[in-house]
Amino acid sequence: MKEGIHPTYYHDAVVRCACGETFITGSTKKEIHVEICSKCHPFFTGKQKFVDTTGRVERFMKKYGLDQK
């Protein structure tokens, strides 16, 4: 490998989640911020989060004249 062209690798990079969880990993960035992690993701927690997409579908139907009234 060529010298001086590779990014610095940090073996103790800190990952911070929006839920407050932090853990250490290896990365080319010293600190990483994420919105969701294994402590708060529904797949790992077993809890379901419902996202309100009804309004988006209704807007799409109305925009393209596909109202089913």
Swiss-Prot record:
Question: Which UniProt keywords are present, listed alphabetically?
Answer: Metal-binding, Ribonucleoprotein, Ribosomal protein, RNA-binding, rRNA-binding, Zinc
Provide the cofactor note recorded for this chain's UniProt entry: Binds 1 zinc ion per subunit.
Top-level taxon = Bacteria
Annotated Zn(2+) binding lies at 17, 19, 37, 40
- Kindly state a single biological-process term from the GO annotations of this entry: translation
Q: Which cofactor does it need?
A: Zn(2+)
Family membership, please give it. Belongs to the bacterial ribosomal protein bL31 family. Type A subfamily.
Task: Tell me the subunit arrangement.
Answer: Part of the 50S ribosomal subunit.
The task this protein performs is described as: Binds the 23S rRNA.
Q: What protein does this entry describe?
A: Large ribosomal subunit protein bL31
Gene name, per UniProt, is rpmE
